[in-house]
A protein has these predicted regions:
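N-terminal glycine-/serine-/threonine-rich phosphate-binding loop
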Residues: 1-28, 48-61
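Structural motif
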Residues: 28-31, 160
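Active-site histidine-anchored catalytic micro-motif
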Residues: 38-42, 46-53, 57-79, 102
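Ligand-binding beta-strand-loop-alpha-helix segment within the catalytic cores
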Residues: 65-127, 132
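Glycine-rich, aromatic-bearing surface loops/beta-hairpins
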Residues: 108, 112-180
Length: 180
């Protein structure tokens, strides 16, 4: 099962990367309920081992493309973000070290696995994966656009995805760059 979780995680972020047209330096916010991944209700059966496989799949892909992960903590840490300092080198950090029952298993794995992890109260990511209905919208740039993935399951959890685009301004006579 571990290899399957790794592969599903890798496939989901890979598909999002292509659809969202992410590029080097982009940030992808990840919300994850490992309880949902293992077939339980969110918040009831956290799995540190499952989180490890998810993190490896996501991080291996992210490193290969030069993008950054921003892992959303659970509500006990007010949905703070764990990311790498290089993603936002001048951001104001907060002092917390996530734990499986205070921050979540994936955030804990990320804190241990990132090269130079930092915690932030908030972030504005370019795209996002919501694994198991964790609600990541507060950490996406405006304007969020839903993305339907073919790879929409990790274990038993439903995977929802979003990309972002620049706001359209200017009204009826304005011209827009569809690549943004």
């Amino acid at each position: 099962m571990d290899r399957i979780i790794y592969e599903q995680s890798y496939a989901a972020i890979s598909e999002l990367y292509e659809i969202a047209k992410l590029r080097e330096g982009s940030i992808v916010v990840i919300g994850c309920s490992t309880s949902e991944v293992v077939g339980s209700t969110i918040g009831t059966n956290s799995s540190f081992e499952t989180a490890g496989e998810i993190f490896k799949g996501l991080y291996d892909f992210a490193k290969s493309k030069g993008i950054y992960l921003a892992i959303q903590c659970c509500e006990h840490l007010n949905r703070a973000i764990i990311t790498e300092r290089a993603a936002l080198p001048f951001a104001e950090i907060v002092n917390v070290v996530p734990q499986p029952k205070a921050g979540g298993s994936l955030a804990t794995q990320a804190y241990a696995g990132f090269e130079e992890p930092v915690a932030l109260e908030e972030i504005k990511a370019d795209a996002g994966l919501d694994i198991g209905f964790t609600l990541i919208g507060m950490h996406l740039k405006k304007v969020a656009v839903p993305v339907r993935l073919k790879n929409n399951k990790i274990g038993s959890a439903t995977v929802l995805a979003a990309r972002t685009r620049a706001k359209y301004i200017g009204g009826a006579r304005a011209m827009y760059n569809e690549e943004q």
